[in-house]
Amino acid sequence: MLSPKRVKFRKQQRGRMRGVATRGNTIAFGEFALQAQECGWITSRQIEASRRAMTRYVKRGGKIWIRIFPDKPVTMRAAETRMGSGKGNPEFWVAVIKPGRILFEMGGEEITPEIAKEAMRLAQYKLPVKTKFIALGDEEKTAGAKTPAASKAVTVES
């Protein structure tokens, strides 16, 4: 599973998720992508489950790029622990997702739009946020749109 090798601080505050993604919101490597429609946290386990689902479907046909990385530690206290006595220990890692963020990309000579769409649909079921499938041509047309929800891309909502 994905996690940072080393971090400056072991624990982080939860923070707020406001606005839309300003970075990582365009297709950079492949021809097809899965774009987030709402904000949320995606754990390293969910990223791995999505990756496995896509990889199993496309087999050796193409290449998959993971465009998010879980770099935020989530701490938890032991069950039935009284209040106080500090913050809990880091239990797992999450990636903070904002609307418009590209989560996964897919490309290759053997990857058709139908194969990519089905593989991304399988990955959508593993994720806790609403997403949509976009292709390289669709994404360029919607670059001027203010929000990802306003885009005219091919949508497959989960």
Swiss-Prot record:
Gene Ontology CC annotations of this record: ribonucleoprotein complex; ribosome
Record Gene3D superfamilies: Ribosomal protein L10e/L16 (3.90.1170.10)
UniProt-recorded name of the protein: Large ribosomal subunit protein uL16
Domain of life: Bacteria
Record's keyword terms, sorted: Ribonucleoprotein, Ribosomal protein, RNA-binding, rRNA-binding, tRNA-binding
Naturally occurring in which organism (per UniProt): Synechococcus sp. (strain CC9902)
Pfam short name (any one): Ribosomal_L16
Family: Belongs to the universal ribosomal protein uL16 family.
Subunit structure: Part of the 50S ribosomal subunit.
UniProt xrefs under PANTHER family: 50S/60S RIBOSOMAL PROTEIN L16 (PTHR12220), LARGE RIBOSOMAL SUBUNIT PROTEIN UL16M (PTHR12220:SF13)
A molecular function GO annotation: structural constituent of ribosome
GO BP term, pick one: translation
Keyword tRNA-binding in record: yes
Entry function: Binds 23S rRNA and is also seen to make contacts with the A and possibly P site tRNAs.
The keyword Ribosomal protein appears for this protein: yes
Gene: rplP
Stretches assigned to coiled coil: none
